Amino acid sequence: MKHVLKNDWGPLLAPEFEKEYYRELDVFLKEEYSIHVVYPKIEDIFNALEYTSYENTKVVILGQDPYHGPNQAHGLSFSVQPGVKTPPSLLNMYKELRDEYGYDIPNNGYLVKWAEQGVLLLNTVLTVRQGEANSHKGKGWEHFTDRVIELLNEREKPVIFILWGRHAQAKKKLITNSNHHIIESVHPSPLSARRGFFGSKPYSKVNTILANMGEREIDWEIPNL
């Protein structure tokens, strides 16, 4: 599962692929993909980094592990492939977006438009076995994605980290550079959204920060497909 990242993440993350933890992860993944159905497809594992280069990252929305149902995951946190029903957490994200900006809820959950504008949609674990949430937890991905966060933390140009829920907020310890911004609330999951996600206005907070920095704001509206 070694991968040549075609943008500026390539040289930054190349040392990770040579480390012992990644070699063990690689052996595990080759076996998993050969005997089980694993998501996303091998060629989509690193899509978050492919769509959003290091230099172009303005915002990070941290997820946990990929969706584990058929045709959902394609390497971007919270996003699903076209033609697939919008999952409940993403639907709540859209409801909050509607309340903030008045956008209609789109007929899809395909968030590539965000990624192309500099929103890094990063899961902390990048693969999962079909139907088994967290099945690839603790196999090595966390070391890899922690390094992604650490590299962004080292950047002088500010990054806005959106941390929803305790799992994402546990990564706050990696964000030590005071140049960066953290926006946090409970998770948009139906289990917690009414306890502080709805009304938290994350999208307009991001754009206020970007505007104050003289950066182009994110156009959060997802078009119908």
UniProtKB/Swiss-Prot annotation:
Active site per the UniProt annotation = D65 (proton acceptor)
E.C. numbers: 3.2.2.27
Q: Gene3D superfamilies in the record, alphabetically?
A: Uracil-DNA glycosylase-like domain
Q: Which domain of life is it from?
A: Bacteria
Please tell me one Gene Ontology term that the record gives under cellular component. Answer: cytoplasm
Specify where it is mainly localized: cytoplasm
Q: Which biological process terms from the Gene Ontology are attached to this UniProt entry?
A: base-excision repair, AP site formation via deaminated base removal
Instruction: Extract the SMART domains matched here.
Output: UDG, UreE_C
Entry GO MF terms: uracil DNA N-glycosylase activity
Q: Does the keyword DNA damage apply?
A: yes
The cysteines joined by S-S bonds are none
Query: What are the protein's UniProt keywords?
Result: Cytoplasm, DNA damage, DNA repair, Hydrolase
Q: Where in the cell is it found?
A: Cytoplasm
Among PROSITE patterns, the record links this protein to: U_DNA_GLYCOSYLASE
Catalyzed reaction equations: Hydrolyzes single-stranded DNA or mismatched double-stranded DNA and polynucleotides, releasing free uracil
The free-text function statement in the UniProt record for this protein reads: Excises uracil residues from the DNA which can arise as a result of misincorporation of dUMP residues by DNA polymerase or due to deamination of cytosine.
The family annotation for this protein states: Belongs to the uracil-DNA glycosylase (UDG) superfamily. UNG family.
Name of the protein in question: Uracil-DNA glycosylase
